[in-house]
Amino acid sequence: MAMTYHLDVVSAEQQMFSGLVQKIQVTGSEGELGIYPGHAPLLTAIKPGMIRIVKQHGEEEYIYLSGGVLEVQPNMVTVLSDTAIRGQDLDEARALEAKRKAEDHIRNSHGDVDYAQASAELTKAIAKLRVIELTRKAM
């Protein structure tokens, strides 16, 4: 049996996941993080994107995160996010529309603030589409 640790993924609305996992992948403020059993304690910001969860028996789950905080403790990892949405619950049409609007906004931006906001929205839309794609492959 593979080594595991306990993971909690919590959004402002609800607990999205609680259980034993083999590993997770998430994008931290300094880049991609792979958290395996026995990882050194860590507290870091996470960027908008996805968390890839490899559960106790090898099944995979993908959850979109709007950003947040990752805390790694011995035998326990916690992810706190304002928004967390399971891959199968994401609306592809809405994500595609958000991506299109963000791209239009970038093309028509008139200043750093407009561009930064549109770029952040584009990043979120692309992350949602990636979660949808990976969720389909895992099913």
Curated annotation (Swiss-Prot):
**SUPFAM superfamilies this protein is in?**
Epsilon subunit of F1F0-ATP synthase C-terminal domain, Epsilon subunit of F1F0-ATP synthase N-terminal domain
Keyword Ribosomal protein among UniProt keywords: no
Q: How does it sit in the membrane?
A: Peripheral membrane protein
What CDD domains does the annotation carry? Answer: F1-ATPase_delta
UniProt main location, coarse: membrane
Superkingdom, natural source:
Bacteria
Q: Where in the cell is it found?
A: Cell inner membrane
What does the entry list under GO cellular component?
plasma membrane; proton-transporting ATP synthase complex
| GO MF term (any one) | proton-transporting ATP synthase activity, rotational mechanism
- What does it do? Produces ATP from ADP in the presence of a proton gradient across the membrane.
Cross-referenced NCBIfam families, in alphabetical order? ATP_synt_epsi, PRK00571.1-4
Assembly, per entry: F-type ATPases have 2 components, CF(1) - the catalytic core - and CF(0) - the membrane proton channel. CF(1) has five subunits: alpha(3), beta(3), gamma(1), delta(1), epsilon(1). CF(0) has three main subunits: a, b and c.
Protein name in UniProt: ATP synthase epsilon chain
What organism is recorded for this protein? Pectobacterium atrosepticum (strain SCRI 1043 / ATCC BAA-672) (Erwinia carotovora subsp. atroseptica)
